[in-house]
Design a protein with these regions (language model features):
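Accessory, usually C-terminal, subdomains that scaffold auxiliary metal cofactors
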Residues: 210-287, 293
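Phosphate/adenylate-binding glycine loop and adjacent helical scaffold
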Residues: 1-218, 287-302
Length: 302
């Protein structure tokens, strides 16, 4: 498998996994569980999708690391402004603990999948087996969030287990991506700005969800302009090549996943893709978003 085929498969897998695993952050069932622990409810909806409360998001995902302080959570998440993450986590741990919110996270994620897909959707046992095999024996070095999911108990139902294994692979690619952009010499603001343009979004739009103030965004744009990566609010050829190199480096780190799936790759995609469409149609995950790299690279919709 050459690098081009690897990238196409790695991005396609990431795209079909994203709504299935990532729906945990938009699940009304999760939000309700977090309210029971003392967090605020979902602050708003966007196109019918319930957005997460900030402290609940940081603590629920951060619970994969155990009772981790805010600085550690900010380090692992990498792209968020630590000055927002740290107090949010400090508040969260004043009202609950990692074990309680991790249980709420798991229960809420599975509950939404059951509500939308049913308790035993077609093909889920095959997906469970394939993703379980692919997600169990990956190296944990430099992969803190993947290692955190790996340490969690696997739910007993095929649907719950498939979600857990998909969450492992989602975090594995996320950890790999962090390694790719940090080793390429970018900071969180710079990679966020480059990524907006790479996705075809205007500057200073999506990155605002990462809580960076305007002054830091402006400084980041200036640094990218000085490196001839951005000019007049658009990527230069060098900027596009640099950002694509980050994505390709991420893909290469996912080679063990693709090789482990082997001949089951197409089956996993064929089962998960319609599930993802149904999750989005039922407002369990944003209907469109930044996780469409696979279709862009392969030149086809998923």
């Amino acid at each position: 498998m050459d690098d081009e085929e690897l990238s196409a498969k790695a991005r396609r897998l990431a795209a079909v996994i994203e709504p299935f695993a990532g729906q945990v952050y938009f699940s009304p069932e999760c939000h309700a569980e977090y309210v029971q622990l003392g967090f605020s409810p979902s602050p708003a909806e966007r196109n019918g999708v319930a957005l997460p409360d900030g402290p609940a998001y940081f603590c629920s995902r951060g619970s994969l690391l155990g009772q981790a302080p805010g600085d550690l959570v900010a380090s692992a998440f990498a792209v968020f402004n630590p000055s927002v993450v740290v107090p949010a986590v400090t508040f969260g741990w004043s009202i609950t603990d990692a074990a309680a919110i991790e249980r709420a996270r798991t229960d809420g994620a599975i509950a939404q999948l059951r509500r939308i897909l049913g308790p035993d959707p077609a093909g889920i046992e095959r997906v469970r087996d394939s993703l379980g095999r692919a997600s169990t024996s990956l190296r944990v070095a430099g992969k803190p969030l993947y290692a955190g999911v790996l340490a969690q108990e696997v739910p007993s139902s095929p649907l719950g287990a498939a979600w857990r294994f998909a969450d492992r692979l989602r975090e594995y690619r996320g950890d790999a991506h962090t390694a790719a952009w940090t080793s390429a010499g970018f900071d969180a603001v710079e990679i966020g700005l480059l990524t907006e343009l790479y996705w075809g979004l205007p500057l200073k739009t999506y990155i605002r969800s990462r809580a960076w103030p305007a002054a830091e965004l402006d400084d980041g744009i200036r640094r990218l302009e000085e490196r001839d990566l951005v000019r007049d609010g658009a990527l230069t050829d060098s900027g596009r090549q640099a950002r694509e190199a980050v994505e390709s480096c991420t893909d290469r780190q996912c080679r063990p996943v693709i090789e482990s799936l082997g001949d089951d790759f197409d089956d996993v995609v064929e089962v998960l893709a319609p599930m993802g469409r149904e999750i989005r149609a039922m407002h369990g995950y944003p209907a469109s978003g930044p996780h469409e790299l696979a279709s862009r690279f392969a030149g086809r919709e998923i």
